[in-house]
C-alpha cells in the first residue's frame, strides 16, 4: 500500500485540520503502516468506491482515513483520530 500517490484539495485539508485536528499530510502516512487495515465502505460508495483505513501515522496516532481512488491516485476525503470509548 505504500506506493500510492495522493492528491487532495487544500481547502478540504484546512477544513479537516480545523474539524478533526489531522492534516492530510499526516493522514497519508497511515498508508505506510504495514499493519494498517483497509475496509470497503459500501454505505458511502454510491458514486465511487470508498474505503476506510485504520492505521498509525508517523506521529504515532491511530487514525481513521476515509478515501477513494481517482485516476490511480488516492484522494483523502476525511481523516480523524480513532477514539475508543469505554463502557
What kind of feature is each model-predicted range?
Residues 1-87:
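Ribonuclease/tRNase effector modules and their secretory precursors
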Amino acid at each position: 500500500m505504500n506506493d500510492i500517490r495522493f492528491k487532495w484539495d487544500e481547502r478540504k485539508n484546512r477544513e479537516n485540520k480545523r474539524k478533526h485536528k489531522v492534516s492530510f499530510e499526516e493522514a497519508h502516512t497511515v498508508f505506510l503502516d504495514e499493519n494498517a487495515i483497509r475496509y470497503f465502505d459500501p454505505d458511502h460508495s454510491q458514486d465511487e468506491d470508498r474505503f476506510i483505513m485504520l492505521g498509525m501515522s508517523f506521529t504515532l496516532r491511530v487514525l481513521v482515513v476515509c478515501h477513494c481512488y481517482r485516476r490511480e491516485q488516492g484522494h483523502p476525503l476525511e481523516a480523524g483520530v480513532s477514539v475508543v470509548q469505554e463502557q
